[in-house]
Amino acid sequence: MKIANTFIKRGAAGGLDLSQAPGVTLTLAERRRSRQRLDLDEGRGELGMAIERGQTLRDGDVLVAEDGTYVVVRAALEDVARVTAATPWQLARAAYHLGNRHVLLEIAERHLQFEYDAVLIDMLAQLGGVTATRLRAVFEPDVGAYGGGHRHGHDESFGDDYALAQAAYHAHEHTPMRTPMPADTATFIPVMATAASTASMTPSLDAGQLAALLHLSSPALPIGGFSYSQGLEAAIELGLVHDEASTLAWIESQLVTVMARAEAPLWCLLFEAWRAGDDAAAHGWNQWFHASRETRELRQETEQMGRSLARLAQELGWGTAATRAAVAALRPATLPAVHACACAMWALPREAGLGAYVFSWLENQVAAAIKGVPLGQMAGQRMLERLRAGLPAVLADARARAGATPPRLDTFAPQYALVSARHETQFSRLFRS
């Protein structure tokens, strides 16, 4: 089998005689790989490709085999969304928001194109001023400043060359992503609850309700929570988390800037909607949460866990048939939506359900750190003790945000999104992406 070690860009191939040259039709994913076996079009044989890693082939580029023969690259038609707008400003605005979602984007003079994603289509519809059309077309996203050059072994170019990945990925230190976190950036003061606040936050549960809450919070619940690190594994890889102190700072930061400001108050809104029988409001907040997940990894995580919990509720017959049907109609079901519904089904107090939801998240984060950093079991228990002490203040903040008019939901967490995006293509992982 012939091997192509180099290629000629389409702009420089104008003087070549390609009239008899075979072609090879490749998807974008295939054009981004550096090492693979290619089946030529029309059954004209096969070609091995081993070009410099980090390159993206484009329609019209020409692969050069070791014997000097040429093979023309043809881009395959793919399922894409094409975005058009009445004004350049509206198109630029759409590009900005898509860029915030780390979307591979093809930018033309009068339109944008990206791999079709129904969630992104919904986001654009909410922005307004643009039209998104689904079609089959060649997809050549702009590689910008990231095309070629040095890579870190996180991308699919290394999919079939483990030794090369190890050499590129583990033979050097990664440059820190940012400066170290200031000592007071991600800490909160543990609040000792007064007798009055304790009564409002921890309403009494009968034995059946307590058992139901423990069941829903159990690590043995088969919804896959232990499989995810929510960016923590990437933070470890980047050197942001490396010992007990930095782990505690990271989890505290996520607790007070991500969980307390968005996911926890949203859980409260979902719980109140389910308890009031307002399926439309519950579905609306479910969609809002799904659209707020900034990376594919985070969207797929909440989809998988929500779907698994919904299936469990269906098979065990939780709640009424009407409520189970309303949960089944969620498209897609997210974890906070289904968890809040389960608490409402069992008539659990809101404060108890919210506390269980947030503590389960904390417990999963600590368990992920014990495996990934790694840390000892006592270190994990010390962190849980510290985090648990500050939980009342976090829950109070979440309830206040949910009770405001309109609700004060804040999803601004750029580092969290960037670290999650890095984890999607991290070469070596313990946790799901």
UniProtKB/Swiss-Prot annotation:
SUPFAM superfamilies noted in UniProt: Urease metallochaperone UreE, C-terminal domain, Urease metallochaperone UreE, N-terminal domain
Coiled-coil features, chain-numbered ranges: none
GO molecular function: catalytic activity; nickel cation binding; unfolded protein binding
Domain of life: Bacteria
Signal peptide range: none
Region annotated Urease accessory protein UreE, chain positions: 1-200
UniProtKB keywords: Chaperone, Cytoplasm, Multifunctional enzyme, Nickel, Nickel insertion
Residue numbers spanned by region Urease accessory protein UreF: 200-433
Main location, first listed in the record: cytoplasm
GO CC terms: cytoplasm
Cellular compartment(s): Cytoplasm
Function: Involved in urease metallocenter assembly. Binds nickel. Probably functions as a nickel donor during metallocenter assembly.
UniProt similarity note: In the N-terminal section; belongs to the UreE family. In the C-terminal section; belongs to the UreF family.
Binding partners and assembly: UreD, UreF and UreG form a complex that acts as a GTP-hydrolysis-dependent molecular chaperone, activating the urease apoprotein by helping to assemble the nickel containing metallocenter of UreC. The UreE protein probably delivers the nickel.
Protein name: Bifunctional urease accessory protein UreEF
Organism this protein belongs to: Bordetella bronchiseptica
